[in-house]
């Protein structure tokens, strides 16, 4: 489900590059492939209790599709995609689409607007407190022996006699759903169906992402 009642697009992170402005400034951008977003189901208040558009992206082999999902997609006349996601939308927006229809980039986004990008962050495996929580190392010398990159004390003694829940400690880092908000959409390549978004987005190359209009766009610095 989307974070807001607005339609977005599913895509794949291609990688990063840079563009140059007319003044010669380099702008780092992430390229996102949002080609062939298609509607698999239109959910209505009368039939489903809420209004939403179910969208799929990519292509998947028929042998990799479960029978219930295959029947659902066959009813809509849509090829099986790699991911399926719902977007809560208004009734007016839902009325513009029907199952099997493609979602055009320009019908959702325009150059210069703010967008939110959601993806799965790169997995780092088991990490220590310094890398995982950005803690500071202990002293390199002056009496410190073999305790340079350890977290130190994690609690007290007999009272309370336990480690409080939520204590920041070592553990698995990354491979989690993360959202980067208020990124500038620098350019739209309609021919190749690409979005060029300023800055970095979660995930590795080839990872799936969701791009939607910004939920809470910030005003420019210095604006009254």
Swiss-Prot record:
N5-methylglutamine PTM positions: 158
Keyword Ribosomal protein tagged: yes
Compositionally biased residues, Polar residues: 137-150
A Gene Ontology BP annotation from the UniProt entry: translation
Keyword Cell membrane on entry: no
UniProt-listed InterPro entries: Ribosomal_uL3, Ribosomal_uL3_bac/org-type, Ribosomal_uL3_CS, Transl_B-barrel_sf
Pfam assignment, any one: Ribosomal_L3
Keywords: Methylation, Ribonucleoprotein, Ribosomal protein, RNA-binding, rRNA-binding
The organism's place on the tree of life at top rank: Bacteria
Region (Disordered): 134-159
Post-translational modification: Methylated by PrmB.
GO (cellular component) term, any one: cytosolic large ribosomal subunit
GO molecular function terms listed in the Swiss-Prot or TrEMBL record: rRNA binding; structural constituent of ribosome
NCBIfam families the UniProt entry points to: L3_bact (TIGR03625)
Classification via PANTHER family: 50S RIBOSOMAL PROTEIN L3 (PTHR11229), LARGE RIBOSOMAL SUBUNIT PROTEIN UL3C (PTHR11229:SF16)
Family: Belongs to the universal ribosomal protein uL3 family.
Protein function: One of the primary rRNA binding proteins, it binds directly near the 3'-end of the 23S rRNA, where it nucleates assembly of the 50S subunit.
Subunit: Part of the 50S ribosomal subunit. Forms a cluster with proteins L14 and L19.
Entry protein name: Large ribosomal subunit protein uL3
